[in-house]
UniProtKB/Swiss-Prot annotation:
GO CC entries: cytoplasm
Annotated gene: fni
Name listed for the protein in its UniProt record: Isopentenyl-diphosphate delta-isomerase
Listed cofactors: FMN; NADPH; Mg(2+)
Function: Involved in the biosynthesis of isoprenoids. Catalyzes the 1,3-allylic rearrangement of the homoallylic substrate isopentenyl (IPP) to its allylic isomer, dimethylallyl diphosphate (DMAPP).
Naturally occurring in which organism (per UniProt): Rickettsia conorii (strain ATCC VR-613 / Malish 7)
Subcellular location(s) of the protein: Cytoplasm
Residues where FMN binds: S68, S69, M70, T71, S99, N127, K194, T224, G274, F275, K276, A295, G296
GO molecular function, one term: magnesium ion binding
CDD domains recorded: IDI-2_FMN
Residues reported to bind Mg(2+): E163
UniProt EC number: 5.3.3.2
Amino acid sequence: MLKDQNLDIERKQDHIEINLTKNVESTLKSGFESIHFIHNALPEINYDSVNTTTTFLGKSLQAPILISSMTGGTTRARDINYRLAQVAQKAGIAMGLGSMRVLLTEPDTIKTFAVRHIAPDIPLLANIGAVQLNYGVTPKECQYLVDAIKADALILHLNVLQELTQPEGNRNWEKLLPKIREVVNYLSIPVIVKEVGYGLSKKVAESLIDAGVKVLDIAGSGGTSWSQVEAYRATNSLQNRIASSFINWGIPTLDSLKMVREVSKDIPIITSGGFKSGIDGAKAIRIGANIFGLAGQFLKAADTSESLLSEEIQLIIEQLKITMLCTGSRTLKDLAKAEIRL
């Protein structure tokens, strides 16, 4: 067990370092580069009246932005999460924590995840890999993770390709959907199911909604490729070649968003995967997302300083607001109907 615990910590350290220092971008595009807003030269709106507020998980957000799940479990991760939480609280945006599996075996790592005292008002999301339900993690333990950080929802992330390109990855993905349903029924808060960068298909979305999942985070291709991250972690040539061969795998974010929104007009959708700006986020809102998420650029900023992270988030918000004004959109509901060309 101790060896497994140490491996969890080592893997988390590797993931931070690789994401900060290596090119791990998918060779696929998100698809949003094909969408263009029709510029409104006479919007008849005061910039100060542009309203980016929304609600998520029963809480108010100043902008429809999620700091997507990244890290936890290490000293460096603690510092990153504290900065993320501080800035998220000030900006009024949501935040996800990295995978919390290590907390089930090493209770002392709670200090790297527990940020509610820093961010008392924002939606905060606990997180664990869904496949862990096939390896002994119980609904009761999922509730423990939620309670430990006073979370508003639990993310069950689907990372099948990442696991299969990890030498120590989990291989058994059989009969997982019934276990997800059990967690949904057991927990006192909503369950979010999230891909990690390869997209959710229409069929998978239908299955998850039928199981009672309340929010979907489609996390399509176009951003970080976790198989490429694992390629850098490979300890031999074969592992590296296997992982590297999936650099262009997945459903582009735009395609995944369209598929999932076709399944349900009502389910809240978080869209992430390849977003670099508030303009990209605005496009996602226009196509059917409720919230858009970013990770990579926030990670790099948070590893440096709170001030740099704050500037990065303010940049995204200002880009979103300017896009709204230049499309004649006073509110996010207006933006969802803005004129576009494909």
